[in-house]
Design a protein with these regions (language model features):
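Well-ordered, non-membrane alpha-helical segments in soluble/globular domains
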Residues: 95-110
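Non-catalytic substrate-recognition and accessory regions of acyl/acetyltransferase enzymes
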Residues: 1-94, 111-115, 126-194
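An acidic- and aromatic-residue-enriched active-site/binding cleft used to recognize and process polar
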Residues: 121-124
Length: 194
């Protein structure tokens, strides 16, 4: 059914495949967190079925109503205004070239009339304190104007370690990002990275 809807709208088989490959990541995440394969992000996949989110290159682009009031440049966006939300799926390096190519593809697909917004832990300003200036994450951040920081989220911990823990000491230190994030959380940042 969903594939038929893609065909009716003239959306390529490649975009369908890339968009639905997302299921693989969420199944893997479920295994990491619970020890069995499955999907516990049901509401996320309605977006795929309703054809509101598409993977175009490295990133996903979703048409949605803004959940926030914000000003970007000279443009005011009110809660409920249509926007294109940019999501960063796991699984591949986030190179500057892949980000730029993906944004070009997103704008070719959705147009340039609506504002584009990214609500991600990768944009947390404190990452500039722990990562090298030339890291892919910092180069990604530099593509955006940071409008606001969401202090209530703990997605970074989940993304960096696969699970949010109450005790900071149980977090592994297998990668440079894990080591830097754990040290940062221990020193400051209210014990978390957004």
């Amino acid at each position: 059914e969903t594939y038929d809807a893609y065909e009716k709208r003239g959306i390529s088989r490649e975009i369908f495949r890339d968009t639905f490959y997302d299921l693989t990541f969420w199944c893997e995440n479920c295994f990491l967190e619970y020890g069995e394969y499955g999907i516990d992000e049901y509401d996320w996949f309605f977006r795929h079925m309703k054809l509101t989110i598409f993977r175009l290159g490295r990133m996903q682009f979703e048409i949605m109503d803004s959940r926030w009031n914000f000003t970007a440049g000279e443009r005011m966006v009110k809660k409920g205004d249509p926007i294109i939300s940019i999501h960063i799926p796991q699984g591949e390096k986030l190179t500057l070239e892949s980000v730029r190519e993906s944004i070009i593809q997103g704008m070719a697909f959705w147009g340039k009339e609506m504002p584009y917004l990214c609500h991600s832990w990768l944009l947390y300003p404190g990452l500039k304190d722990i990562l090298p200036e030339k890291s892919n994450i910092i180069m990604f951040q530099n593509q955006f104007q940071i409008v606001e920081t969401d202090w209530d989220e703990r997605e970074a911990e989940w993304r960096i370690w696969g699970k949010v823990q109450r005790n900071l000491n149980v977090y592994s230190e297998n990668t440079s990002l894990q080591r830097a994030a754990k040290k940062y959380m221990a020193q400051d940042s209210k014990g978390k990275i957004i």
